[in-house]
């Protein structure tokens, strides 16, 4: 059993700019995360459909993506679990000063979750600290908030993505170990788009079935996939080399050209699939020259 009384120590942020940005994001910047949203979600959760059986899940690996206040003593959590995907749940009494849940429900640390419920918002029945994840600080911490915002934007509720969950854990570990944030995030963005069905293979032309050739130029046509670049293509579509696409498929961002072109391609795809809606954490990272 984990030691609830002591709880984990919070990571210290070395950069005051990152500290201010992370505090802003943690409190109010993520879309729709306000008291009113919490109340509205709980109102919907109370409308239980009689024919729907109650769900009970025990000891599911997961992470807290975001938390916001509900009433005086509780929290609404947005969590990402291994087998059940994103879920909303109410943590009753979690805001009380001596609640055993307070030190457990922290960002970027693996926990074991148990819950029950029929509606959209489940009831957290147990949470245990698992640990084993290195602490995050500075630009790594802010990059991790960016991962959470991506998951909240792209992952539908109650849709399990075990492979994406594993990649999320691996990405947090890579960030904690000081790997270059931009390259680590490119890898996560690609896996996210592919696992959630927004993007397909980067190493194959879907129209012809041919493998991408390293010496040719290509575009990624939204909703269709990779094809040869043409003079008539919209100017907003980034032209990338076949070598870049092959490198991305192998999760290799070591070439300078691959790092540059993959960044432009991912910005384009994320902007398209989000229909122009801004990613707040991404803009902060761009301003800080981390993306």
Curated annotation (Swiss-Prot):
Keywords: DNA damage, DNA recombination, DNA repair. Involved in DNA repair and RecF pathway recombination. One of its GO terms (cellular component) is bacterial nucleoid. The keyword Translocase does not apply. InterPro entries: ARFGAP/RecO, DNA_rep/recomb_RecO_N, NA-bd_OB-fold, RecO, RecO_C. This is DNA repair protein RecO. The gene is recO. The keyword DNA repair applies. Belongs to the RecO family. GO terms for biological process: DNA recombination; double-strand break repair.
């Amino acid at each position: 059993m984990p030691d609830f009384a002591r709880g984990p120590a919070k990571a210290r942020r070395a950069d005051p700019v990152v500290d201010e940005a992370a505090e802003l994001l943690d409190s109010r910047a993520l879309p729709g995360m306000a008291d009113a949203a919490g109340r509205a979600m709980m109102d919907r959760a109370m409308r239980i459909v009689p024919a729907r059986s109650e769900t009970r899940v025990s000891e599911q690996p997961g992470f807290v993506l975001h938390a916001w206040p509900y009433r005086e003593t509780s929290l609404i959590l947005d969590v990402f679990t291994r087998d059940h995907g994103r879920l909303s749940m109410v943590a009753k009494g979690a805001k009380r000063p001596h609640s055993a849940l307070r030190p457990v429900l922290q960002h970027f640390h693996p926990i074991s979750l148990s819950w029950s419920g029929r509606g959209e918002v489940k009831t957290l029945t147990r949470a245990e600290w698992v640990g084993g994840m290195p602490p995050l600080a500075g630009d790594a911490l802010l990059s991790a908030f960016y991962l959470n915002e991506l998951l909240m934007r792209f992952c539908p509720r109650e849709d399990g993505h075990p492979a994406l969950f594993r990649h999320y854990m691996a990405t947090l570990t890579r960030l904690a170990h000081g790997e270059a944030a931009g390259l680590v995030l490119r890898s996560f963005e690609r896996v996210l788009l592919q696992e959630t069905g927004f993007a397909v293979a980067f190493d194959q032309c879907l129209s012809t079935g041919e493998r991408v050739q390293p010496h040719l130029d290509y575009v990624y046509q939204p909703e269709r996939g990779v094809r040869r670049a043409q003079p008539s293509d919209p100017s907003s579509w980034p032209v990338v080399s076949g070598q870049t696409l092959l490198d991305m498929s192998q999760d290799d961002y070591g070439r300078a050209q691959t790092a540059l072109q993959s960044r432009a391609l991912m910005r384009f795809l994320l902007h398209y699939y989000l229909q122009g809606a801004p990613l707040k954490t991404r803009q902060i990272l761009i301003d800080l020259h981390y993306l």
